[in-house]
């Protein structure tokens, strides 16, 4: 009897897809640090990294070697188990969240009916990594940064979820592929769910702790925040994890609001991966542009903005969407 039954082949293909996608995401996250430095230099009218290799292209290799050979030091006053666990949880939660992203009609790790809920579960898990890092470091700046990060992340995840409820109401599903196919038959959600898009994008920047919402690791205030005591590859996992978060939020924006792998007006459907990659790259550049152009507000202003602006906006968007869906739903006679 052959071991290669259709079920076994499906499992093998799923594992291969998962390995390829996760390796590609990790490599892209590492390369994104170099791309960001070059773009920031270009936009700010200065040189970026330009010494190592042609156009500074090997700078990322030099940085990785430096990080790899640095001493993996753990402070003697830290809780060593939790201190080591925190960067692992931070990076793995973001990588696992990529399982629900449909890159093309055939490429994706898992086609879950609760795809959106799975994403929020993994996003919530990353909050524990930040709390673990700040608490286990036994450092007042790290603890204050972790408390800032957890409060900010939990607050903006509320609005991130509410921003997507309008899409769920219209599609009637939490499945990511169902959402993409709905947009292929109708308008991309950037038009009917524009308020939801704005709130989701703002919340995405805040959840990834990117500028201008990088108060949890503000160098001028907290001396690098919750990962101040980290060095070597542990710090590198936090560092690369931040860029993986940028890629994840950008891919979600493309999937949920910009038609996923579909081109505009159904142009060149055979180039599904190219369309997905181009749209994701656009939002990644938008993240970097925000860092280059916007100052950092105070922490209390960030929290006030979340509850006084984002919450009313998401609730209004959800109410309008529900009213429109009910209006367009044909009445059913009660027997």
Curated annotation (Swiss-Prot):
It catalyses: a quinone + NADH + 5 H(+)(in) = a quinol + NAD(+) + 4 H(+)(out). GO terms for biological process: aerobic respiration. It is an enzyme of class 7 (translocase). Its EC number is 7.1.1.-. The chain crosses the membrane at residues 11-31, 81-101, 114-134, 154-174, 187-207, 238-258, 270-290, 307-327. It is a multi-pass membrane protein. It comes from the Bacteria. It is found in: Cell inner membrane. Pfam families: NADHdh. GO terms for molecular function: NADH dehydrogenase activity; oxidoreductase activity, acting on NAD(P)H, quinone or similar compound as acceptor; quinone binding. Keywords: Cell inner membrane, Cell membrane, Membrane, NAD, Quinone, Translocase, Transmembrane, Transmembrane helix, Ubiquinone. GO terms for cellular component: plasma membrane. Belongs to the complex I subunit 1 family. NDH-1 shuttles electrons from NADH, via FMN and iron-sulfur (Fe-S) centers, to quinones in the respiratory chain. The immediate electron acceptor for the enzyme in this species is believed to be ubiquinone. Couples the redox reaction to proton translocation (for every two electrons transferred, four hydrogen ions are translocated across the cytoplasmic membrane), and thus conserves the redox energy in a proton gradient. This subunit may bind ubiquinone. NDH-1 is composed of 13 different subunits. Subunits NuoA, H, J, K, L, M, N constitute the membrane sector of the complex. NCBIfam families: PRK06076.1-1 (NF004740), PRK06076.1-2 (NF004741). This is NADH-quinone oxidoreductase subunit H. It comes from Pseudomonas fluorescens (strain ATCC BAA-477 / NRRL B-23932 / Pf-5). The lineage of its organism: Bacteria, Pseudomonadati, Pseudomonadota, Gammaproteobacteria, Pseudomonadales. The gene is nuoH.
């Amino acid at each position: 009897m052959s071991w290669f039954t259709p079920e076994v082949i499906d499992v093998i293909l799923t594992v291969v897809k998962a390995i390829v996608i996760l390796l590609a995401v990790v490599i892209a996250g590492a390369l994104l640090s170099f791309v960001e430095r070059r773009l920031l230099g270009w936009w700010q009218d200065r040189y970026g990294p330009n010494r190592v290799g042609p156009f500074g292209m090997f700078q990322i290799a030099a940085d990785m070697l430096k990080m790899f050979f640095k001493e993996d030091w753990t402070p003697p006053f830290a809780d060593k188990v939790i201190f080591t666990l925190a960067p692992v949880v931070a990076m793995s939660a973001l990588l696992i969240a990529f399982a629900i992203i449909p890159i093309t009609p055939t490429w994706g790790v898992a086609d879950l009916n609760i795809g959106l809920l799975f994403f929020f579960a993994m996003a919530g898990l990353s909050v524990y990594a930040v709390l673990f890092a700040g608490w286990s470091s036994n450092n007042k700046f790290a603890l204050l940064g972790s408390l800032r990060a957890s409060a900010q992340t939990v607050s903006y995840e509320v609005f991130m979820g509410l921003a997507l409820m309008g899409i769920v109401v219209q599609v009637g599903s939490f499945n990511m592929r169902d959402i993409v196919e709905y947009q292929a038959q109708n308008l991309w959600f950037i038009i009917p769910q524009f308020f939801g898009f704005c709130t989701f994008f703002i919340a995405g920047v805040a959840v990834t702790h990117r500028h201008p919402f990088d108060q949890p690791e503000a160098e001028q205030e907290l001396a690098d925040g919750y990962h101040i005591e980290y060095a070597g590859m542990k710090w590198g996992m936090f560092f690369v994890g931040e860029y993986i978060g940028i890629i994840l939020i950008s891919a979600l924006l493309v999937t949920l609001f910009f038609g996923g792998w579909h081109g505009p007006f159904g142009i060149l459907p055979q180039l599904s991966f190219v369309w997905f990659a181009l749209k994701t790259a656009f939002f990644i550049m938008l993240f970097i542009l925000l860092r280059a152009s916007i100052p950092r507000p105070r922490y209390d202003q960030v929290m006030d903005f979340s509850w006084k602006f984002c919450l009313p906006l998401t609730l209004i968007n959800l109410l309008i969407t529900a009213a429109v869906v009910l209006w367009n739903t044909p009445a059913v006679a009660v027997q």
